[in-house]
Amino acid sequence: MTYLLNERICALFRSNWQHTLTYWSVFFSFGLCVAFLGPTILDLRCQTQSTLQEITLVFFSQQFFLFLGSTIGGFFSKTLVSSLSSLAVSTLIISVVFAIIPLCRELLMLAFAMAVSGLAMGTIDTISNLQLVKIYQKDSTVFLQALHFFVGLGALVSPLIADPFLSDTSCVIGNSSVNTTSLEDLRNKLAGRHVHNVSNVHLHTDGEVVTNVSYAFWIMAIINLPVPIAIFVLVYRERLFMCGSDPSRRLLDGDVLAIKPRGTSILAEDTGQKETSNSHADLFSCCLLGKAHSFPLSFFGIHVLGGLVLFFSDGIVGSYTGFVYTYAVAPPMNLPHKTAGYLTCIFWAAITTGRLSAIPLSYRFKPVRLLIVSQVGVIVTVLLLLIFSNSSVFLFIGTCCLGLFISSIFPCMLALTEDILEYKGCATTVLVTSAGMGEMVLQVLVGSVMHSRGSFSFLLCGMIFGCLGFTFFTFLYFVQQSHKSYTEALPGNSPVERHEENGIKTCSAAVLNSWDAPEHKTSLDP
């Protein structure tokens, strides 16, 4: 069975390899944008000749517009041409932003550039997740894990590119200088996504600017440039230009036809098209109040609960990357600044490794099982960090374990929720938006609590967020059972039949027709 499963997934990938690789490369661009701001923020402060308090506003600018981009990204995904066009424009914008950042000599110009990049990142986040889910459906977990692996890969590559060009001493030469050690400590402190409590840090704002960080941004712009080119090639290959194609072509039309064999009968083609229409025609109908009466409460409950799970899980990721350094250098840890600076890198490396290792695990285990292990692992890890709060060694071990456990929650949750809703509604848009909101809101909350209650509250907040996430996941399980019973009881609205060939469930009617084994087809209980 495992061999046949791998064979089917490989067949799906071969039929959609260009789409899939394009979406993965797009998320690499997303990862580049995620991590470049922290290491380069001091050089950008010098470039704009602003204070440290003022330059940290660009963090909020990028994060807020990333949230907005995640929200509006779903509205560009109704057709294949609009989806690919949005991705091409967004990735091209990222390259342009990288190229013009060295030219932004004013703080407002830099904040505007970060806002534009955040908007592009949010659009990429929603559309890429949505397209992979719609292509692979039941098998999307494997490909979503790989998709989010490329985020971590980009987040690791970006600081490595920037590091050789960062200033070792004060990059604004004034009447006096800031020693190298202080600048390195500040850069380590700014390695997170958000920065607080910097009002007591004073650096020169007037004087001669000496920085080579421009080369880092231009290199990243060049590295990212093949991504929009690849998308335009894909658009050309699919013949989606407006002058020679139907602009209303649905998102899955090309994908379903791509995996349909040449010998498929007309009846099978009609069946596949009917299923596609029923499953995806009303992608955003759950967001329209006029049609709300046609859905049960459990339908909306699944959206809300799934969003809350990712709200807290991504909130943990954001707050941990933003404040683990502050926690490590404060009592009772009192780690050296340079040593504490490695924690954020270790956390991102663990997330990247976890997503890579989750790819083969997704072949063997259902998303719900991976989610249970991940959620429990997060809670246990944070609990152990609380118990061994005086151990600097366990802080590094716990950081690594936390990254490994939390890495696969987002892709598994996305695949599970879409599967429950049978790929109807706007689950992907809601989940991606909720994750972005959690990352933005909970970072501010943790920063405020740490400022008023001390560094120990950092882990306590993580424990509370982890428990809340697992609680909402438990509620989701019971609501899912209620939703399943409701949909099965509706007259004339039985769930889409799932077939099994040689013990393997197919993900769509088109895929079913691509397997030449007409015998032993039986329906399966989802």
Swiss-Prot record:
UniProt signal peptide: none
Keywords on record: Membrane, Transmembrane, Transmembrane helix, Transport
Membrane disposition: Multi-pass membrane protein
Main location: membrane
Record localization: Membrane
GO molecular function: transmembrane transporter activity
InterPro entries: MFS (IPR011701), MFS_trans_sf (IPR036259)
SUPFAM superfamilies the UniProt entry points to: MFS general substrate transporter (SSF103473)
TM ranges: 21-41, 55-75, 84-104, 107-127, 142-162, 215-235, 297-317, 341-361, 377-397, 401-421, 430-450, 458-478
Record-level GO cellular component terms: membrane
Stated family: Belongs to the major facilitator superfamily.
Protein name: Major facilitator superfamily domain-containing protein 4A
Gene: mfsd4a
